[in-house]
Amino acid sequence: MDQPLPTHELIERLRAGLSSDGRKVQVGLDVATSLRVPGALSGPLAGASFIAGVAGAVALSDSPYPRPGAQPADVRRYFRGSPGAARVSVVGQLVSATSLAWFTASVAKLAEQSERGSRGLRATAVSGGVLAAASLATSALCAAALTGSRGEQDASAAALHRLMFAAGGPVHSAGFGVLVGALGLAGLRTGELPRPLAIAGLVSATAGLLSSLYFVTDHGVWFIPAGRFSGLLVSGVAGVLLARRFRTS
């Protein structure tokens, strides 16, 4: 017949069991914390708000959007003739810029989980995100100014339109490309994103960076929409996946 264990031995075994269970719980909490990517859903919000603003402006406008280098009369016709349409686009851009700033924190958090080069990758993500958000906001404010008295004079209208396109076009695309590239690389290193999506992010980043060629040749303008819309798609899908991963962790 088995002898009952002494009381002190029972107490020691109970303590050991509780300690082991506590360590398991702590490990689980650490894993959940490491997978936390705050504000990940700001990725799809950045794309949705930008596209909604553009679509709303197109639907409400009475004249075509002035292309880069357009005559001041064409700029006035759009911004002064359809100020409501232009302001819809402005709101969409400002919401998108705010969302990008928030999403930058998510990408930086993901970059911190990389095993190697995490500090450099995080700094790259923050730099690209800040440039992308600031340049898009600058472009939106220029567009808003064009709907007011600043858009009435040829000289000021032309200058604002040039600044608006430069900030919201090649400058924004380059910064956004850096951010999306950091997202793709962090996704590859951590395994938090599907490999095809992470590689798509790197390809999109290349297009975004090449948009800077617009300052050298007009042919570089084609890289702007290529980098922007592919980047919005990648960041949107990645944001949904990262948010879902956090909820199930």
Model-derived regions, located:
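Hydrophobic, aromatic-enriched alpha-helical segments typical of multi-pass transmembrane helices
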Residues: 2-249
